[in-house]
Amino acid sequence: MATDIKKMISNLMEFYDFKNQTIITVGSGGGQFIEYGHVSKNVMAIDNDEIALQKLKENLVKSGLDSKFTLIHSDFYLTNLKADVVMFEFCLHEMKDPLAAIKHAQTMAPNILVTDHWPDSKWAYYVDEEEKVKKSWAAINSLKTKKVQEYDGLQLFNDYEEIYQKVKVQGENSIRRIAEFKDKKNITIPMSYGFALI
């Protein structure tokens, strides 16, 4: 599978100025977007998934950014840190109550940056997350935003087996939805995403 991560990072760096910022990241997982660490002051990465944090640590070492990041294995709601910005990395839709998550983040920083699937993203449909994504954007839109931007991206897969391996953890709905790709090669799925600054 491939997405144009470099383009997503470029869009993120244009959307928000991370220079000399203290950043709290939520759901930083495997560290796909760690490039902002090069210009930031420091980063506190919170994730409740130890395996994801281990992968992040490995990526930080490879990138030479390990000294700028503090990894925190915790439930986000149990943290009480201070920073310039709290960034949700494609995870707000996974929060049980997205509005409560944003409100908690607002106690930690004056700026809240959300990166997530766009509500009408085809990819969100295939991975059976469209309702969760709509709920998270409804929470975002219920608040005063400083700016919001939608982007178009693509998910690329060599064949059905590759897409199946990616979505099987999402459950039976996802597996049914990708059935249309059986026996197909070079599969392209639109993945619109957006950034919101609150």
Model-identified regions with their sequence ranges:
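Conserved alpha-helix/loop element of class I SAM-dependent methyltransferases that forms part
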Residues: A2-Q21, Q32
